[in-house]
Amino acid sequence: MIYRSTGRVDVGVSAIGLGGHEYLPDGRSRGFNENANLAVTPGYLYEGFGQEKRKAVLAAAYEHGINLLDATIDSEKEALGRNLSEMPPPYEVYVQTRPEGMVYSYDPHNARLARYDLLQAEVARGLDLLGRTRLDFLNLGFLQGALDHDPDYLRKVAEGLARLKREGLIRYACADTFSGEGTYLRQIEQDCFDGIFINLNFADDGAVGKVLPAAADRGMAVFAREAFMKGALFRMGEEAGIVDRNSLARTALKWVLSQRQVTAVMVGVDTPEQLASNVSVLDDPEMAAEELSILERVRETASYRDYVAGKREQFGQ
């Protein structure tokens, strides 16, 4: 395993992190694709999370030296906390999560994130689910509408994060958004975040131009997600006639890890074998001729071009 730190995140985190998603038989993630409203309802727990299949994935993560773990919804938080208690890791691990029902489009204007009393209570509730006394990475994903609605929004968020750190409830904070480049740059410029959590892949690379360099200039960690484009990568591969999904996935991961500002890439896997294939890219992280050829073949597909156009518009480019 490769470990990386930055000026603001002074612990070594594994270059590949493990996401908290568990999966339905058809490959879609659990929770959101069962009932999206219930998935983000604070306190709602789906049955069957954190069972033997997930424990096998977590055990494999330990074997590979993965120390960066992410949990999204309450079902994932509770399962991760339970599994870490049942299967204590052989080294220190770092956990990221987000306030339930307060981020992205789940709360109008993300107003509750800017109220310290509500944010503090939600962080404490999440810590109880995780069985931890301090959260390593608090992810705050708010949209541009929050900034437009409240000119003091970023100041309030910054003050709240500083208080959470002083009270020992969080160690680091990560900026996140789905509003694109301009919002990320304002989050970075506020100088209250220690890292960013961002969609990044070879078909959604808008952040490479300004956002990643801006984060790196401030010593922030860059945590990348969606290397596989929520499965769109494999549909592009089918169109290009690429039958080896593992090679396609490894190529996509290598592209992300080749961006010099990237600290870690988060992956979602269903089996230990999938995780082992993903981690194997670190044995030889340089792009080989065969992998460069795979990229070119995918880039020639209509589905790739359509995906790129949509993502560039979404990112504000």
Which residue ranges define each predicted feature?
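Alpha-helix-loop-beta-strand connector modules within alpha/beta enzyme cores
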Residues: 80-99, 157-168, 223
